[in-house]
Every structure is written in structure tokens, then in C-alpha cells.
């Protein structure tokens, strides 16, 4: 969604601050998208911050990551406000779609044109798009294609609990998988259990 969103809004602003929220920092399969965007859109600046889920992961030592019981928790709105203040950003744009979930559909339909929250200065240009529409837009504009984990699974970001994502990394980006396991050691157990079940089924 971020690929289409950036292309849609880039002609209308002098400067765009793109925020990539990472679960594991500096993964090569993510960096290639960031590099692509920075080269294609001269008015874009990329910053990287931890995904809001990372703070709760650290609080409980999720999947073996370094635990910090005193870790402060943040949500999406709080992180948005932090970035806005630091980079002097007036309007925030998001790739949320009504088709993503019931909650998003209900939220987006309360806004002007189903996608403009004038009070909070937040905008959702993809509100009425479906996944199919986003992929058609990307194809029509000749943009970089999103990763596909396999024939049935489109990328949904770095979901370290998704076995399809982990298998994708193991097959195509083994160095990235090492970085994931280094941060979240128990991820390796998920792969071990998957391989064990496959071996038993043979």
C-alpha cells in the first residue's frame, strides 16, 4: 500500500517525510524499497523508527528479544505525533483501506469523503481501494512490485510470527533471517517446528 500511496501524493508536496516502522532494523529486502523510493522521488526523505509493537515486545521479552519491564509503550497515534513535532509535519497520510478490516471501515467512513480527518489533519487516500486496486495501480504506473511470500501470500510487512514470511526470508534473504533471529531468537523454533512437521508428513 505504501508504494501506491507515495506515488499518489508525491506530485502535490514539496517535501514528504516517509516513516518506515521496523520490527527488525536494516533488512535488505526492505532497504531496496526505501532506496527505490528515494531515487524515484526527489522530494522524499525516509526516516526509520521502531514499530509500535516493538515496544510491547521489549516489555515482555517476546520471542526471546531483550526484555525491559520498564519499557514505555507507544501506539500509532503517539508515534505519529512524535514524528510530526520533530519534523514539523502538518498533515499525516496513511495507507489504510476500508477493505483491511471492519474497524478500519467503520473509522474511515466517519471522515469527510471517507478519508479526510480535518480535525486531526490525517488523510487516507487509499480508503476506497481494495488490494486488487492497489496492485492494478502499481502495475499500470510501472512501480516496483511488493514482495510476494508465495503464490498465495502477498507481503504484509515484517510479520515475524508468519511462517510464510520466515520461509520467504530463508529462501531469498538468508542474511535478513539471521538478523531477525538475532533480535528474536525463538523465531528459529518456529522454523524448526515447521521443518519437523513437514518431515513427519513425508
Description of each model-found segment:
Residues 1-202:
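Nucleotide-activated chemistry modules centered on ATP-dependent adenylation/adenylyltransferase
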